[in-house]
């Protein structure tokens, strides 16, 4: 009985064992095979997601079914021109380019496979090669590609199989370039050597069946000679037959098809990224929407709401559009209403493809057509946002400009990569600090956080001076440079790129914020080169704020941008073989740590949040003027003060420190003049502080500043100055309490009797040239400083009597106190010429400085040399040369 009761349980156990054994033999291998296929098919779309991959995204997408083609539409296969020629220098012998962009490294050679691609590599069953085309092999002659045509532009990112998971299918985009026999060696060759190499697919050039020019070797191009087609213009038949060729030979091999001109430039990486976000199984017709010129409106046979894609920037067709449209090309050729091939292609797509060119406004930016005034057939201005945002650029009819544009695009990419290296150095330095490990020397040099305070000067001659600039002019105190000059092309280009990157950072999240900010102009700015770190900018930008969410608003705003272009690691390429051992021995080991300094590409980075300048800083400026005698000069100063401050009602206060001798008679006129202005402007703040004894500028300024609180903004001024309103604003902007003191470099006039040849001086004092004056870069008397910073630095040395030296002493104290002196040319102030009288009783050091200042005010070195030659040699020179 016990044995019989166990029989059902033994049967169940035996059945389970047999069932699991059969499942492992029959079912498990099939499941593993299906999982492997699914993994291969989905890995190609992992970057953009399954929804953007079209019919290859998964099994739920039905495969497109080929349509039957009318017999009369079948044309004989076009003749293929095997144009033999030297291989392109960029191509490696026997290796197909696997790069989807020029900066992606190709996979190892062993990852390539012979024959057709395996099923799952593209998401579709492996398609056989086109009729008459041999399968691609690994080995081959230099420049050989598929179909045996030399120089064929069949590019891609990988072919599946053993490729890396990030590899993408090669057969993604087919580009047909329309050209003519006369342009094969110029425009077509330029396109092949520039953008065509970076298309994620194949690029072929379509021309007529005419024989090439006799006596000239054909260029190394993949040329398709269309039968029965010539190079006449307009190329309507050529365009339709090229589209038919794409359909007949590559419909099931590529997802997207593009018709392009030979004078267009295409950014392959941006185009691939854009197209992978769309579904090629849907009928899509992409390009810049066109309606015709103003003269042609109503004459193109377009109904209201109909359009076409302009042929210049390029037309892009999805696979489904070609599947629907091409069987009816014969009917489209017989029923044309205009001579414009792009209009007729658009009409055919709309009629038989079931779609038309997209109406999206953004297409005008992505497919860029150059509408510059007085177009010359090439894109001249490269430093603007339109060039950077575009995918295709048209036209560049001259090959030299095509190479120029390509070189600029490569340089932009190099700059982005170098900036990325700087970011990585910063991250590495930060992680070393967080992990309490030693920071490498390279990270110490290149991973520093941007700042204006990397270099702390210890003496006044170590202070790096700033150059003042406007949108068109540069004011510099550098040796052997004119004080006022136009912006050089190099500096203008650098400013354009700088502003362009600033605007990209400002508008990075413009769509989500519902606003857009446009650049108008540079109001003014400062620039200097820190040889240890990079170029530094302070720019006052005039912008337009446009709000497009909610209540629409457009207002002008100003921003104060603090920027730095950092030096990155230099890269060298030796054109000759060098003896490394002898080279190492000849290099000083002490200079190796500074090898990162070079005149290399600089990358813009924002290291301080842009300070919005919606309204001016209206801090009250307290103008302190020490004075003794010189009533006529004081009268001129007060007239200028009235025009610049009293009439415009500037937020200023004038303090006159009036020194007088024992008699006091020489100060009575000054007091009456001040009282007259006080009566005329009762609300104006003007104060006169009388002082007895010998003149001491430092003592007078120290006594006057002692009457104000610590938050007072002080301007130490001289009676010989003529200034404008903008100088007062820059005094406010460039002085930062506790951080920065503004030391403007003043333009000083020469003796007008010498510069004008005895003629009376002009009324316009603000004329900057080598003939009229010079930048007083050795003067530190004019200062904008807060009272608290003056006290922190130690104040003036009141023991200094007479002329000079007190300003140099205060400047040294400012540096030693840790404050940052801001030095730049100030175009809003001019030091008017006056005869200098040096007292022999002065301190020897002061007396020597006074004589040097007196000698520098006569005239320029060139003018003095001319005067001497005229007097002693009787030779007349042209004074305008200076």
From Swiss-Prot:
Keyword Membrane part of the UniProt annotation: yes
Cellular component GO terms held in the UniProt record: Golgi cisterna membrane; Golgi membrane
Cytoplasmic side: 1-7
UniProt similarity note: Belongs to the chondroitin N-acetylgalactosaminyltransferase family.
Protein name, entry field: Chondroitin sulfate synthase 3
Chain spans, region Disordered: 46-167
PANTHER family assigned: CHONDROITIN SULFATE SYNTHASE 3, CHONDROITIN SYNTHASE
Compositionally biased tracts (Low complexity): 59-69, 120-131
Superkingdom: Eukaryota
Pfam families, per the entry: CHGN (PF05679)
InterPro entries: Chond_GalNAc (IPR008428), CS_glycosyltransferase (IPR051227), Nucleotide-diphossugar_trans (IPR029044)
Protein function: Has both beta-1,3-glucuronic acid and beta-1,4-N-acetylgalactosamine transferase activity. Transfers glucuronic acid (GlcUA) from UDP-GlcUA and N-acetylgalactosamine (GalNAc) from UDP-GalNAc to the non-reducing end of the elongating chondroitin polymer. Specific activity is much reduced compared to CHSY1.
Tissue: Detected at low levels in brain, cerebral cortex, uterus and small intestine.
Entry keyword Transferase: yes
